[in-house]
Curated annotation (Swiss-Prot):
This is Serine/threonine-protein kinase DBF20. It catalyses: L-seryl-[protein] + ATP = O-phospho-L-seryl-[protein] + ADP + H(+); L-threonyl-[protein] + ATP = O-phospho-L-threonyl-[protein] + ADP + H(+). Gene3D superfamilies: Phosphorylase Kinase, domain 1, Transferase(Phosphotransferase) domain 1. Keywords: ATP-binding, Kinase, Nucleotide-binding, Phosphoprotein, Serine/threonine-protein kinase, Transferase. Residues 470-547 form the AGC-kinase C-terminal domain. One of its GO terms (molecular function) is protein serine kinase activity. Residues 169-469 form the Protein kinase domain. Present with 3320 molecules/cell in log phase SD medium. Residues 24-62 are annotated as: Disordered.
Length: 564
């Protein structure tokens, strides 16, 4: 199927390469089904373009013969007994969906390419005809320019067939570190595209059964067209690694903003939580629930607006290892005694929370994770729906205004204890003079987000109608002026991310490196499976190579010339 399509494009290229500039009057096809014959020699021996040839359907007798051959050679067989069971599995459904999207994208892209190539050819022919008729340019010069155009078109055609590779990217600096790999600021060499290149260790992913999470992240990134979600530019793989080249969001994450500001003004907190709701709603509209939202998942772009990233846990379930670990922690703290949650002041709790994040330096980066933002029904392994993301947003709004999460304690165990009895420990913070730290409408929103599923807000429309958002115009939110705009030197400025050449910054990832090295030592080379089906992706926007045509010394930019 693919080779036939490529041959058709090659035939078109062959027809064009035989054109000469002795007769530029190319006959137009007489019908939409018209096809071009290969170029032939005219009576004077000169090459002329192929003439249109109308499509002629085969006779009915031929069609019957063709059908009979199909029925004889491909007689139906009985389906396996487990066919329907296998067909209903989520893994099978994903492959089917990816396959459908792949073929739709493949053929739409191919047809766009053929149409745009014909348009470019007509433009060049008109230009060369003008050169000959108006400026009396010689046929030799015209043919040289035509040959140059053909060379550019062949380059574009070759690029269409090339899959992205690691060597196509220039690594600039490291900007992130995870349990399964690294994130680098990189530049694509042929197009100068700046991206965040996530490189994941295939051995670890297969060893820990995390490939489904990566595939889900890839699927979400390729599906989204929303400005609220980080977009995928390229996805590819080699025997050792999986690669996700995403748009680079240079303003750092919301966690960094909270660390630098400690607390936000009420108006600023309202702006950011509004944008977070928009981003989460964009994910929900795609049919996914994030399940593990935290400040690190929200990035700030160059204009100061929010983008949601890191969709690995949106596959449908959190990993069994993580859930079991958290359930064990919940059980362990069941009978422990801790100081009363409400006895501490806002300032005391704020200090405890920040000290714990410093002393337990891997608190937020651990492979198991912390329970600060995760809804209780997720931790307990119970059934849940998309509103668990609203619980997480309620925790983040709480933290933005007072500087600590609603269930934070002096230790991880105490945090689990507070979460286990959240109805008792969730209290409206008060200042030293006993004034409420939150306005009534702020507290009303928080208690509608951090609530039992039956009492939790059920939709984004309900959220928008709450009095807390009375000043927010959600329709124009993304074009409004944000409280903070990153100060960037250029598009490769990574100053808002950790410096991986700095020992202090690297200390945050000590536990991640230790666990990664331990797992790597356990993985055998034979553990690497075959290629992941439906992983490769190439976006169709932006600069992806040029097939520009020189018109009077200037490059002609064609909207379709970026396809390859």
């Amino acid at each position: 199927m693919f080779s036939r399509s490529d041959r058709e494009v090659d035939d078109l290229a062959g027809n064009m390469s035989h054109l000469g500039f002795y007769d530029l009057n190319i006959p137009k096809p007489t019908s939409p089904q018209a096809q071009y014959r290969p170029a032939r020699k005219s009576e004077n021996g000169r090459l002329t373009p192929g003439l249109p040839r109308s499509y002629k359907p085969c006779d009915s007798d031929d069609q019957d013969t063709f059908k009979n051959r199909i029925s004889l050679n491909h007689s139906p067989k009985k389906l396996p007994k487990d066919f329907h069971e296998r067909a209903s599995q989520s893994k099978t459904q994903r492959v089917v969906n990816v396959c459908q999207l792949y073929f739709l994208d493949y053929y739409c892209d191919m047809f766009d390419y053929v149409i745009s190539r014909r348009q470019r050819t007509k433009q060049v022919l008109r230009y060369l005809e003008q050169q000959r008729s108006v400026k009396n340019v010689s046929n030799k010069v015209l043919n040289e320019e035509w040959a140059l155009y053909l060379q550019r078109e062949h380059e574009v055609l070759r690029k269409r067939r090339l899959k992205p590779k690691h060597k196509d990217f220039q690594i600039l600096t490291q900007v992130g570190q995870g349990g399964y790999g690294q994130v680098y600021l990189a530049k694509k060499k042929d197009s100068d595209e700046i991206c965040a290149l996530k490189i994941l260790n295939k051995k670890l992913l297969f060893k820990l059964n995390e490939t489904n999470h990566v595939l889900t992240e890839r699927d979400i990134l390729t599906t989204t067209r929303s400005d609220w979600l980080v977009k995928l530019l390229y996805a590819f793989q080699d025997p050792e690694s999986l690669y996700l080249a995403m748009e680079f969001v240079p303003g750092g994450d919301f966690r960094t903003l909270l660390i630098n500001t400690r607390i936000l003004k009420s108006g600023h907190a309202r702006f950011y939580i509004s944008e977070m709701f928009c981003a989460v709603n964009a994910l929900h509209e795609l049919g996914y629930t994030h399940r593990d939202l935290k400040p690190e998942n929200f990035l700030i772009d160059a204009t100061g607006h929010i983008k949601l990233t890191d969709f690995g846990l949106a596959a449908g379930t959190v990993s069994n290892e993580r859930i079991e670990s958290m359930k064990i922690r919940l059980e362990e703290v069941k009978n422990l005694e801790f100081p009363a949650f409400t006895e501490r002041s806002i300032e005391d709790r704020r200090k405890i929370y920040h000290n714990m994040r410093k002393t337990e330096i891997n608190y937020a980066n651990s492979m198991v994770g912390s329970p600060d933002y995760m809804a209780l029904e997720v931790l307990e392994g119970k059934k849940y729906d998309f509103t668990v993301d609203y619980w997480s947003l309620g925790c983040m709004l709480f933290e933005s205004l007072v500087g600590y999460t609603p269930f934070s304690g002096s230790s991880t165990n105490e945090t689990y204890e507070n979460l286990r009895y959240w109805k008792k420990t969730l209290r409206r913070p008060r200042t030293e003079d006993r004034r409420a730290a939150f306005s009534d409408r702020t507290w009303d929103l928080i208690t509608r987000l951090i609530a039992d599923p039956i009492n939790r807000v059920r939709s984004f429309e309900q959220v928008r109608k709450m009095s807390y958002f009375a000043e927010i115009n959600f329709e124009t939110l993304r074009t409004s002026s944000p409280p903070f705009i990153p100060q960037l030197d250029d598009e490769t400025d990574a100053g808002y991310f950790d410096d991986f050449t700095n020992e202090e910054d690297m200390a945050k990832y000590a536990d991640v490196f230790k666990r990664q090295n331990k797992l790597s030592a356990m993985v055998d080379d034979s553990a690497v499976d075959s290629k992941l089906v439906g992983f490769t992706f190439r976006h169709r926007d932006g600069k992806q190579g040029s097939s520009g045509i020189l018109y009077n010394g200037s490059e002609h930019s064609d909207p379709f010339s970026t396809f390859y």
